[in-house]
């Protein structure tokens, strides 16, 4: 079960989506339901700030977590 993230964490996710205009950084779709995705997973000690996040559309975000999509974190 996903734990509820602290306010500062949710704030950073919203900031990165705003900075990237809710545009997926993989497929370039603009989607109002875009997700703030961690480059280094939060559960693995990744920070909860915009330097460790990118915007993904729900489809690409799901594909990533299913292992169907690879993201080169050094590209960002």
UniProtKB/Swiss-Prot annotation:
Keyword annotations of the record: Hydrolase, Nuclease, Oxidoreductase
Keyword Oxidoreductase: yes
TM annotation in the entry: none
Organism superkingdom: Bacteria
EC number of this enzyme: 3.1.-.-
Single Gene Ontology MF annotation: endonuclease activity
Boundaries of every HNH domain copy: 24-66
Gene3D superfamilies for the chain: 1.10.30.50
Pfam families: HNH (PF01844)
Family assignment from sequence similarity: Belongs to the HNH nuclease family.
Protein name: Anaredoxin
Native source organism of the sequence: Nostoc sp. (strain PCC 7120 / SAG 25.82 / UTEX 2576)
Gene that this sequence comes from: adx
């Amino acid at each position: 079960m996903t734990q509820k993230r602290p306010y500062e964490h949710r704030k950073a996710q919203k900031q990165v989506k705003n900075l990237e205009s809710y545009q997926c950084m993989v497929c370039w779709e603009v989607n109002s339901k875009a997700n703030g995705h961690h480059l280094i997973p939060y559960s693995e000690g990744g920070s909860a700030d915009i330097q460790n996040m990118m915007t993904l559309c729900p489809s690409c975000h799901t594909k990533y977590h299913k292992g169907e999509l690879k993201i080169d974190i050094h590209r960002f």
